[in-house]
Amino acid sequence: MRHNNAGKRLGRTTSHRIAMYRNMVTSFLNHERITTTDAKAKGLRSIAEKMITLGKKGDLNAMRQAASFIRDKKVVTKLFTTIAPRYAERAGGYTRIIKLGIRPGDNAPLSVIELVEETIQAPKAKKKIAAKKPATKVAAKAASATAESAPVATANDAAPAEEAEVQGVKDPAEDCEAKAD
């Protein structure tokens, strides 16, 4: 019976599961973002957040505890010097899981687990207002009549404005070609 044993077993023995999580948390803290299955990402999240909390403590005992779980000394140093200070004012929730879809080979649900960046905010999308189609034929005729009576810009009038815009903007393809030469 598995009473009072929290956590998913993931079809592995205890030693294999612990070794897998040690490898995953080391890789996660090194790269700050990894792709894995949903179940592994959910299990990794709690361990990674505990490691970051240890990093926020910053004392020698916390460093030794983190080093006993994380396999690489450079990653432990990175945790205590760069990652943990980023979240000094945050009380938890250092990671986010983004679902990607399914893996083609075995239909396993994939996710990306990454560290939350406080400074980066998603840009707000501009809403485009589309022209509504006229509901009746009478409205369509009225709309076409107003369009015909409006002054029409000639090609010569629009050309200087387009040239002014093009002169200030660099084509990214030109930069790539220059680098290739």
Swiss-Prot record:
Compositional bias (Low complexity): 141-159
Family: Belongs to the bacterial ribosomal protein bL17 family.
Name of this chain's protein: Large ribosomal subunit protein bL17
One Gene Ontology biological process: translation
Keywords: Ribonucleoprotein, Ribosomal protein
Subunit structure: Part of the 50S ribosomal subunit. Contacts protein L32.
GO molecular function, one term: structural constituent of ribosome
Stored Pfam families: Ribosomal_L17
UniProt-listed HAMAP family: Ribosomal_bL17
Biased composition (Basic and acidic residues): 171-181
Matching InterPro entries: Ribosomal_bL17 (IPR000456), Ribosomal_bL17_CS (IPR047859), Ribosomal_bL17_sf (IPR036373)
